[in-house]
A protein has these predicted regions:
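N-terminal Rossmann-like NAD(P)+-binding domain of SDR-like oxidoreductases, especially those catalyzing
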Residues: 1-165
Length: 165
């Protein structure tokens, strides 16, 4: 059975992703790490297709010891990072939590994955995946008549939230 780590899985998008992947792959086990801040709710995880394949852990992606322990205990080969402080107005009023979670938390996930996957387990790049979920906010504003954004569009964030993603 494959096991993935989903961070921010109690939020709207993360929980819908969990519902989807569990429906699509009946052999998949999901470890769901979420701090349960203002954006997350365990109500979003009701009616999972097979609750026995879902394990919820309340915790912080900035906690490297916890992340490393989860990777090792569950032999995780894929991380899908939805965890984020994501409220634009809150980021303007107080940007530090956004930097902490969105920048340092992602760096912690990447570092723990590197330590486990590449140094300790020595898996090849074909065996591991890290999916970071961002936002179109990183590109700034799109005015009527502007060309659509592409992968080559330069970043032009308009808020601390967008800059932190």
């Amino acid at each position: 059975m494959n096991t993935i780590l989903v961070t921010g899985g109690a939020g709207f998008i993360g929980s819908n992703f969990i519902h989807y992947v569990m429906e699509q792959d009946p052999a998949l086990k999901v470890i769901n790490l979420d701090l349960l801040t203002y954006a997350g709710s365990l109500e979003n995880l009701k009616e999972l297709p097979d609750p026995e394949r879902h394990h919820f852990v309340q915790g912080d992606i900035c906690d490297g010891e916890l992340v490393g322990r989860l990777l090792r205990k569950h032999k995780i080969d894929t991380i899908v990072n939805f965890a984020a402080e994501s409220h634009v107005d809150r980021s303007i009023a107080g940007p530090l939590p956004f930097v902490q979670t969105n920048v340092m938390g992602t760096a912690t996930l990447l570092n723990e994955a590197r330590l486990y996957w590449l140094e300790e387990h020595r898996w090849s790049a074909k065996e591991i995946r890290f999916h970071h979920i961002s936002t179109d906010e990183v590109f700034g504003a799109l005015a009527p008549g502007d060309p659509a954004w592409t992968e080559e569009t330069p970043y032009a964030p308009n808020s601390p939230y967008a800059a932190s993603k």
